[in-house]
Amino acid sequence: MRKPIYEMNPKHNPFTENFDIKIWGELHGGMECAVYHFAPGTDVTPGLQTFGGFCPIPHWGYCFKGEMTVRYEDGKEEVIRAGDVFYSPKGHTLIVDKNAPVACEIIEFSNMADFGETEAVVAKTAKK
């Protein structure tokens, strides 16, 4: 059964008015399996400022609703859409267009040690 990890929304978050993330997850054999809900307008870059604005760990995943733009440190971008399987190496951030008609929802797999450490830092940036 998936368990809530944390939720960040406008009342918790200092970064942007439309920052709305819900995350559920579970540990399986040293891997974290997390389901993310990113509302339209979500930009995770401000939450990654401790890491230079880019996520320091790789993720594997599947997008089952909506779409998101993944931006890499080298300036390249790719759009992940519903039905896409993806791999995001370390050095990425993501943005959901504020005019998107639906939220972006993904399931993502990450090394538990890396994921837990990174998510703890990001969660500390949320308002209490």
Regions found by a protein language model. Give the residues of each.
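A short, polar/proline- and glycine-enriched secondary-structure boundary/capping micro-motif
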Residues: 45-47, 81-82, 116-120
